[in-house]
Amino acid sequence: MRKYRLSEEQRAFSYQEDGTKKNVLLRQIIAISDFNDVIAGTAGGWIDRETVLAQEGNCWIYDQNAIAFGGAVISGNTRITGTSVLWGEVYATDNVWIDNSEISQGAYISDSVTIHDSLVYGQCRIFGHALIDQHSMIVAAQGLTPDHQLLLQIYDRARVSASRIVHQAQIYGDAVVRYAFIEHRAEVFDFASIEGNEENNVWLCDCAKVYGHAQVKAGIEEDAIPTIHYSSQVAEYAIVEGNCVLKHHVLVGGNAVVRGGPILLDEHVVIQGESRITGAVIIENHVELTDHAVVEAFDGDTVHVRGPKVINGEERITRTPLAGLL
């Protein structure tokens, strides 16, 4: 059963693809039967051909300023609202809701995903009950890492707000990401929280992972930008906050708190237990901090700890050990 027809009137639309200006002719969809919340005679958005919007299901392009073309496919019960633009082999199906957003170049969106006021570009998979909003930018790109086939994915109940997720990053589980820049093959999952702000984003790159109930938070001071590099991980109930840089093979786990700054952790550093690091601290080269150990720098001082070394029990370091200077 057909639910809409295309208008006789045509409308030209210009767009850029790979730096080349292109044009497409669009025709407006007009409902010819009542279905869901759409009444016969209602005019909707504009498409370039009937294959864009399925005649089956309750899918509909509600706003007369919304457009879909260039191999886009909208099916199931998908709702397209606001001034959305879908083009370039995009698939939106099941119970997806796309509002005031641009989706292009191979994105596949399914299940009960909601996308508000955001951009999704490139071959990626967004599914489950994921939510993307607050002017987020999802820009997928393959071929920049050794894992050429990996697709950028956001799924389960993950929420991404006011963030840039690029390359082949993975956001899933019940993860919450706000004001962050996550790139390459970095992952955020489980109940992890990435919390930047309007002043400073959190930056995850390379193969960094944040998971468990871990929290990574930016501060509002200048340079209070947590940066997780390479294969470093923040896990369990750990908190990393402020001007902190985790570089090569760093693990912060347990109930540890790392609060900069600036703090630099590098080369096989493990922070776990109930341990705490605050102030201007550098820890590098096979150092383990565990139990209730504390490394704390006071105003104007920098504490530098070099390994190999284990700091545990109730040990407290507030100035650079002599061995740390070697």
From Swiss-Prot:
Keywords: Acyltransferase, Repeat, Transferase. One of its GO terms (molecular function) is nucleotidyltransferase activity. It comes from the Bacteria. Signal peptide: none annotated. SUPFAM superfamilies: Trimeric LpxA-like enzymes. The keyword Metal-binding does not apply. InterPro entries: B_solenoid_ydck_rpt, GlmU-like, Trimer_LpxA-like_sf, YdcK-like. Its EC number is 2.3.1.-. NCBIfam families: YdcK_fam. Belongs to the transferase hexapeptide repeat family. This is Uncharacterized acetyltransferase YdcK. It comes from Escherichia coli (strain K12). The gene is ydcK.
